Protein backbone atom coordinates (compact mmCIF):
# COMPACT_ATOMS: atom_id res chain seq x y z
CA UNK A 1 0.00 0.00 0.00
CA UNK A 2 1.35 3.39 -1.01
CA UNK A 3 1.84 5.97 1.73
CA UNK A 4 -0.51 8.94 2.05
CA UNK A 5 0.06 12.49 3.28
CA UNK A 6 -2.04 15.54 4.05
CA UNK A 7 -0.78 18.90 2.79
CA UNK A 8 -1.64 21.74 5.17
CA UNK A 9 -1.01 25.46 4.96
CA UNK A 10 -1.40 28.34 7.41
CA UNK A 11 -3.92 30.79 5.96
CA UNK A 12 -6.19 33.73 6.69
CA UNK A 13 -3.37 35.59 8.41
CA UNK A 14 -4.09 39.00 6.88
CA UNK A 15 -5.42 41.64 9.27
CA UNK A 16 -7.29 44.75 8.19
CA UNK A 17 -5.30 46.56 5.50
CA UNK A 18 -2.24 44.38 6.18
CA UNK A 19 -2.01 41.50 3.71
CA UNK A 20 -0.24 38.19 4.28
CA UNK A 21 0.17 35.20 2.00
CA UNK A 22 -1.30 34.10 -1.33
CA UNK A 23 -4.11 31.96 0.03
CA UNK A 24 -6.33 31.66 -3.02
CA UNK A 25 -3.51 30.40 -5.24
CA UNK A 26 -2.10 27.97 -2.67
CA UNK A 27 -5.51 26.44 -1.89
CA UNK A 28 -5.52 24.49 -5.16
CA UNK A 29 -2.51 22.45 -4.00
CA UNK A 30 -3.33 21.66 -0.34
CA UNK A 31 -5.85 19.47 1.45
CA UNK A 32 -6.07 21.23 4.84
CA UNK A 33 -6.14 24.92 5.78
CA UNK A 34 -5.07 26.21 9.20
CA UNK A 35 -7.02 29.45 9.55
CA UNK A 36 -5.90 32.24 11.89
CA UNK A 37 -8.43 33.14 14.56
CA UNK A 38 -7.64 36.77 15.34
CA UNK A 39 -4.78 36.61 17.85
CA UNK A 40 -1.79 36.70 15.47
CA UNK A 41 -3.68 37.51 12.29
CA UNK A 42 -7.10 37.00 10.81
CA UNK A 43 -9.78 39.63 11.40
CA UNK A 44 -13.46 38.54 11.25
CA UNK A 45 -13.85 39.36 7.55
CA UNK A 46 -10.65 37.52 6.66
CA UNK A 47 -11.81 34.51 8.66
CA UNK A 48 -15.12 34.46 6.78
CA UNK A 49 -13.47 34.87 3.38
CA UNK A 50 -10.83 32.22 4.05
CA UNK A 51 -13.41 29.67 5.21
CA UNK A 52 -15.43 30.33 2.05
CA UNK A 53 -12.38 29.97 -0.19
CA UNK A 54 -11.29 26.73 1.49
CA UNK A 55 -14.77 25.26 1.14
CA UNK A 56 -14.86 26.23 -2.54
CA UNK A 57 -11.67 24.22 -3.09
CA UNK A 58 -12.81 21.24 -0.99
CA UNK A 59 -10.09 21.87 1.59
CA UNK A 60 -10.54 20.74 5.21
CA UNK A 61 -11.03 23.57 7.71
CA UNK A 62 -8.74 23.93 10.71
CA UNK A 63 -8.37 26.49 13.48
CA UNK A 64 -4.92 28.04 13.99
CA UNK A 65 -4.96 29.51 17.52
CA UNK A 66 -2.10 31.65 18.77
CA UNK A 67 -0.72 33.50 21.72
CA UNK A 68 -2.21 37.03 21.92
CA UNK A 69 0.53 38.71 19.88
CA UNK A 70 -0.58 40.60 16.78
CA UNK A 71 2.52 42.80 16.75
CA UNK A 72 4.86 39.81 16.83
CA UNK A 73 2.74 37.61 14.55
CA UNK A 74 2.44 35.07 17.37
CA UNK A 75 6.08 34.09 17.12
CA UNK A 76 7.27 35.54 20.45
CA UNK A 77 7.25 33.19 23.41
CA UNK A 78 5.50 34.40 26.56
CA UNK A 79 4.89 32.86 29.94
CA UNK A 80 1.35 31.53 30.26
CA UNK A 81 -0.27 29.01 32.57
CA UNK A 82 -1.96 25.85 31.30
CA UNK A 83 -5.31 27.41 32.22
CA UNK A 84 -4.51 30.46 30.10
CA UNK A 85 -3.53 28.19 27.20
CA UNK A 86 -6.81 26.30 27.59
CA UNK A 87 -8.82 29.53 27.55
CA UNK A 88 -6.97 30.91 24.53
CA UNK A 89 -7.62 27.77 22.51
CA UNK A 90 -11.29 27.42 23.48
CA UNK A 91 -11.91 31.07 22.58
CA UNK A 92 -10.22 30.96 19.19
CA UNK A 93 -11.41 27.52 18.08
CA UNK A 94 -14.93 28.48 19.12
CA UNK A 95 -14.76 31.66 17.06
CA UNK A 96 -13.71 29.87 13.87
CA UNK A 97 -16.21 27.08 14.49
CA UNK A 98 -18.90 29.75 14.51
CA UNK A 99 -17.67 31.19 11.22
CA UNK A 100 -17.66 27.71 9.70
CA UNK A 101 -21.16 26.96 11.03
CA UNK A 102 -22.46 30.16 9.45
CA UNK A 103 -21.44 28.65 6.09
CA UNK A 104 -22.89 25.22 6.81
CA UNK A 105 -19.55 23.62 7.63
CA UNK A 106 -17.62 22.14 10.56
CA UNK A 107 -14.01 22.28 11.56
CA UNK A 108 -11.80 19.26 10.86
CA UNK A 109 -8.67 20.01 12.91
CA UNK A 110 -6.76 22.38 15.17
CA UNK A 111 -3.11 23.36 14.86
CA UNK A 112 -1.52 25.82 17.27
CA UNK A 113 0.51 28.64 15.74
CA UNK A 114 4.05 29.84 16.14
CA UNK A 115 5.37 30.18 19.67
CA UNK A 116 2.35 28.44 21.19
CA UNK A 117 2.99 25.41 18.95
CA UNK A 118 6.70 25.34 19.77
CA UNK A 119 6.16 25.80 23.50
CA UNK A 120 3.56 23.03 23.68
CA UNK A 121 5.76 20.68 21.65
CA UNK A 122 8.12 20.58 24.66
CA UNK A 123 5.91 21.49 27.64
CA UNK A 124 3.68 18.58 28.65
CA UNK A 125 1.38 20.73 30.80
CA UNK A 126 0.72 23.22 28.01
CA UNK A 127 0.23 20.36 25.56
CA UNK A 128 -2.35 18.73 27.84
CA UNK A 129 -4.20 22.03 28.24
CA UNK A 130 -4.36 22.61 24.49
CA UNK A 131 -5.56 19.08 23.77
CA UNK A 132 -8.16 19.24 26.53
CA UNK A 133 -9.45 22.52 25.10
CA UNK A 134 -9.75 21.00 21.64
CA UNK A 135 -11.58 17.94 22.96
CA UNK A 136 -13.92 20.03 25.10
CA UNK A 137 -14.95 22.14 22.10
CA UNK A 138 -15.39 19.14 19.75
CA UNK A 139 -14.07 15.66 20.47
CA UNK A 140 -14.15 14.81 16.75
CA UNK A 141 -11.47 17.36 15.89
CA UNK A 142 -7.99 16.20 14.87
CA UNK A 143 -5.01 17.70 16.71
CA UNK A 144 -2.13 18.60 14.38
CA UNK A 145 1.18 18.64 16.28
CA UNK A 146 4.91 18.33 15.71
CA UNK A 147 5.78 14.70 15.02
CA UNK A 148 6.97 12.90 18.14
CA UNK A 149 6.27 15.87 20.42
CA UNK A 150 4.45 16.37 23.71
CA UNK A 151 1.39 17.51 21.73
CA UNK A 152 1.04 14.10 20.11
CA UNK A 153 1.49 12.32 23.44
CA UNK A 154 -1.10 14.55 25.13
CA UNK A 155 -3.67 14.03 22.39
CA UNK A 156 -3.31 10.26 22.54
CA UNK A 157 -3.54 10.27 26.34
CA UNK A 158 -7.05 11.77 26.26
CA UNK A 159 -8.31 9.90 23.21
CA UNK A 160 -8.05 12.80 20.78
CA UNK A 161 -7.08 11.86 17.23
CA UNK A 162 -3.66 13.25 16.36
CA UNK A 163 -1.88 13.91 13.07
CA UNK A 164 1.90 14.05 13.28
CA UNK A 165 3.15 17.07 11.40
CA UNK A 166 6.37 17.50 9.44
CA UNK A 167 7.76 20.52 7.62
CA UNK A 168 9.01 21.00 4.09
CA UNK A 169 10.81 24.29 4.64
CA UNK A 170 12.34 23.85 8.10
CA UNK A 171 15.40 21.95 9.26
CA UNK A 172 15.37 19.60 12.24
CA UNK A 173 17.55 19.15 15.31
CA UNK A 174 18.74 15.82 16.69
CA UNK A 175 15.91 15.75 19.26
CA UNK A 176 13.26 16.04 16.54
CA UNK A 177 12.50 19.68 17.29
CA UNK A 178 12.56 22.31 14.56
CA UNK A 179 15.67 24.45 14.31
CA UNK A 180 14.78 27.86 15.82
CA UNK A 181 14.11 30.53 13.20
CA UNK A 182 16.80 32.67 14.84
CA UNK A 183 19.48 30.27 13.58
CA UNK A 184 20.90 30.72 10.06
CA UNK A 185 20.17 27.16 8.90
CA UNK A 186 16.56 27.07 10.13
CA UNK A 187 14.84 27.61 6.79
CA UNK A 188 15.01 25.59 3.57
CA UNK A 189 14.66 27.93 0.61
CA UNK A 190 15.72 25.57 -2.19
CA UNK A 191 12.79 23.64 -3.68
CA UNK A 192 14.82 20.56 -4.63
CA UNK A 193 16.20 20.32 -1.09
CA UNK A 194 12.68 20.66 0.32
CA UNK A 195 11.35 17.94 -2.00
CA UNK A 196 14.16 15.57 -1.03
CA UNK A 197 13.41 16.15 2.65
CA UNK A 198 9.68 15.63 2.13
CA UNK A 199 10.10 12.37 0.22
CA UNK A 200 12.47 11.05 2.85
CA UNK A 201 10.04 11.83 5.64
CA UNK A 202 6.98 10.41 3.88
CA UNK A 203 8.58 7.31 2.31
CA UNK A 204 11.28 6.45 4.81
CA UNK A 205 10.00 7.96 8.05
CA UNK A 206 13.19 9.89 8.71
CA UNK A 207 14.86 13.27 8.25
CA UNK A 208 18.50 14.34 8.21
CA UNK A 209 19.69 17.18 10.41
CA UNK A 210 22.05 19.89 9.09
CA UNK A 211 24.95 18.12 10.82
CA UNK A 212 24.17 14.80 9.13
CA UNK A 213 22.28 12.89 11.82
CA UNK A 214 19.20 10.83 10.93
CA UNK A 215 16.06 11.31 13.03
CA UNK A 216 13.08 8.94 12.85
CA UNK A 217 9.62 10.48 12.62
CA UNK A 218 6.11 9.74 11.39
CA UNK A 219 4.60 11.97 8.71
CA UNK A 220 0.80 12.27 8.67
CA UNK A 221 0.53 15.89 7.55
CA UNK A 222 3.02 18.18 5.84
CA UNK A 223 3.10 21.93 6.45
CA UNK A 224 3.77 24.34 3.61
CA UNK A 225 4.12 27.86 5.02
CA UNK A 226 1.89 30.29 3.16
CA UNK A 227 3.84 33.36 4.29
CA UNK A 228 7.15 32.42 2.70
CA UNK A 229 8.05 34.28 -0.53
CA UNK A 230 7.94 31.15 -2.73
CA UNK A 231 4.91 29.52 -1.10
CA UNK A 232 3.12 28.92 -4.40
CA UNK A 233 6.23 27.47 -6.06
CA UNK A 234 6.82 25.18 -3.07
CA UNK A 235 3.19 24.06 -2.89
CA UNK A 236 3.02 23.22 -6.59
CA UNK A 237 6.44 21.57 -6.75
CA UNK A 238 6.00 19.46 -3.63
CA UNK A 239 2.54 18.26 -4.65
CA UNK A 240 3.76 17.27 -8.12
CA UNK A 241 6.75 15.42 -6.64
CA UNK A 242 4.53 13.49 -4.24
CA UNK A 243 2.10 12.55 -7.01
CA UNK A 244 4.94 11.41 -9.28
CA UNK A 245 6.15 9.19 -6.44
CA UNK A 246 2.74 7.54 -6.14
CA UNK A 247 1.95 9.06 -2.74
CA UNK A 248 -1.74 9.68 -2.08
CA UNK A 249 -2.65 13.21 -0.99
CA UNK A 250 -5.65 13.54 1.32
CA UNK A 251 -6.75 15.29 4.50
CA UNK A 252 -5.43 13.67 7.68
Swiss-Prot record:
Superkingdom as given in the UniProt entry: Bacteria
Gene Ontology biological process terms from the UniProt entry: carbohydrate metabolic process
Stored CDD domains: LamB_YcsF_like
Broadest EC class assigned to this enzyme: hydrolase
Catalytic activity: 5-oxo-L-proline + ATP + 2 H2O = L-glutamate + ADP + phosphate + H(+)
Keywords tagged on the record: ATP-binding, Hydrolase, Nucleotide-binding
Protein EC: 3.5.2.9
Gene Ontology terms for molecular function: 5-oxoprolinase (ATP-hydrolyzing) activity; ATP binding
Pfam families documented for this protein: LamB_YcsF
Family of the protein in this entry: Belongs to the LamB/PxpA family.
Subunit relationships: Forms a complex composed of PxpA, PxpB and PxpC.
Role according to the record: Catalyzes the cleavage of 5-oxoproline to form L-glutamate coupled to the hydrolysis of ATP to ADP and inorganic phosphate.
Record's protein name: 5-oxoprolinase subunit A
Organism of provenance: Bordetella pertussis (strain Tohama I / ATCC BAA-589 / NCTC 13251)
Gene name for this UniProt entry: pxpA
